[in-house]
Amino acid sequence: MLKLNKLEKQTIRPAAEVDDVCAQLCSVAVQFEDAWERKDIEFAADLEGAAYTQADPGLLELVWTNLLSNAVKFTPQGGSITLRQTRANGKIYVSVTDTGCGMDEKTIKHIYDKFCQGDTSHSTEGNGLGMALVKRILELTGAEMQIESTPGKGSTFTVVLAERK
């Protein structure tokens, strides 16, 4: 909550540097290995390899951590999560796809609202600020988020970043 507040008031200024998104994703993903094993979640990573962008690496890591944490939280026992990173037309695409509870259009519209939790059955597992933080970080880095979701089937969150060669 403190980091979101500081980002909103711009007391934290992003320290942009050229960084490898693929390496970041690998580093963050391994932190969730125990969580996947506990829930018997099948995790797959399909990463194209080195992909460089200019952004604050610490802030981007918060985005990846939040997206993977939500995927683990909302994916049931025995489900699956796929982390994918591709490049095309000067852009880097990072997507997290899960077989979780999914969301309807109304929930998607409010996903970035502070204290909003789409599935209240998991309300004890978070404070509803994660996606508000993600939105602010993406605004500061010039990135965007695309969301596709089907209730009862799962969701895909795709972050689109400018590639830096």
Describe the predicted segments one by one:
Residues N5-A16:
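Helix-loop junction within the histidine kinase core
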Residues A15-D19, E37, E42-Y52:
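Conserved catalytic submotifs in the C-terminal HATPase_c
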Residues M103-F115, K135:
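Short conserved segment of the HATPase_c
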Residues C116-G126:
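Glycine-rich ATP-lid/hinge loop adjacent to the conserved G-boxes
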